[in-house]
A protein has these predicted regions:
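C-terminal motif of bacterial Sec signal peptides marking the signal peptidase cleavage site
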Residues: 15-19
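Insoluble glucan recognition modules
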Residues: 21-76, 83-85, 92-175
Length: 175
């Protein structure tokens, strides 16, 4: 009788350890994103005078890749919302969408590029102007399928400065 109890409880435990269906194992599949939202910055309507120490904070929501993907984010600027030429602000990508800090120096360099300024003599000081900002996101593994551009936000009063890095000189002594 004791052996029957062991056999019965073993079969009962085996019955509870099985299920009717196999667990579904799904690997995340990269979808082509359709929405990517850049939030309006807090300093949108304020006067921003760019210096090398200035930072402009942006936040955005992640593109809908179908899963939480680690994407690279690049900030782009232009002088009009429907511009055909956008200049990327950062060389190294951002990774944290909750805390994108645009450097004042990088933003001023992008503004100089948009104005076509290449030398210090060609720079003329101008009043604060509207600068349009958007983000570009992509995943390194599949940039063609994952690339998406966020909506455009405007920083209404941005005053730039001459921030282009000019080539230096090397002085040699001798013949």
């Amino acid at each position: 009788m004791k052996k029957l109890n062991y056999i019965f409880f073993s079969l009962l435990a085996l019955l509870f350890a099985t299920s009717c269906e196999e667990p579904q194992v799904e690997n995340p599949v990269l979808k082509t994103p359709t929405s990517f939202v850049l939030n309006n910055p807090v300093m949108q309507k304020q006067y921003i005078e760019l210096t090398p120490e200035t930072t402009v904070k942006l936040t955005a929501s992640q593109p809908d890749y179908g899963y939480a993907a680690a994407a690279d984010y690049f900030a782009q600027v232009a002088f009009s919302e429907d511009a055909t030429e956008w200049v990327e602000v950062n060389e190294e990508p951002y990774h944290d969408l909750g805390n994108i800090q645009l450097s004042g120096e990088e933003l001023a360099m992008a503004m100089c590029k948009l104005r076509g300024i290449e030398t210090e003599e060609g720079y003329t000081d101008e009043d604060a102007r509207a600068v349009y900002v958007r983000l570009r996101a992509e995943i390194k593994a599949e940039p063609e399928k994952s690339a998406i551009v966020a909506d455009v936000v405007v920083l209404e009063q941005v005053k730039g400065y001459f921030a282009l890095k000019l080539p230096g000189y090397i002085y040699l002594i001798g013949d």
